[in-house]
Amino acid sequence: MKCELLAEHNLALMLDFVDDENTKYDEAVLKAFLNEKNAYGYIAVDNGKAIGFAYGYVLNEPDGQKVYYLHAIDVVEGWQNQGYGTELVRFIHKHSKTLGCRKMFLHTYKHNASACRCYEKAGGICNAASDDIVFVFK
């Protein structure tokens, strides 16, 4: 398995990728995403097949520092709980450092034990005492 930045050369792999919400990806939309400033996509590939996908954004803070927000990560069922997600998160974290980000953050649910394990194994620190609540508007 290898992790890569999503780019023109591996874009076709995403057209067959189906995430846990059965999202189908459109080539034109993916190309537009690649052209967005501060937006990054990542792909995990095993035997020529996309088995994981993630994306996030560099956020500029008012003090001039940058942080990386990992918005979504998904590993195809059948490849989950085998370390692929952990490797993808490590790859993204390393990439965020090359972009000059002082930290990377993400949101997940406390009851999502497998995701929490993945992020902890990748080096993330869970602030279990935090009283943060994430509101989602659809």
Annotate each predicted stretch with a short phrase.
Residues 1-65, 71, 89-90, 132:
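Acetyl-CoA-dependent GNAT
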Residues 69, 74, 105-107:
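Conserved beta-strand segments that form the floor/walls of ligand-binding pockets within enzyme
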Residues 76-78, 82, 110-111:
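Active-site acidic-Proline motif in GNAT/NAT acetyltransferases
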Residues 79, 83-91:
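Conserved acetyl-CoA pyrophosphate-binding loop and the N-cap/start of the following alpha-helix
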Residues 86, 110-133, 137:
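Conserved active-site alpha-helix within GNAT-family acetyltransferase domains
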Residues 96-107:
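Conserved GNAT acetyl-CoA-binding A-motif
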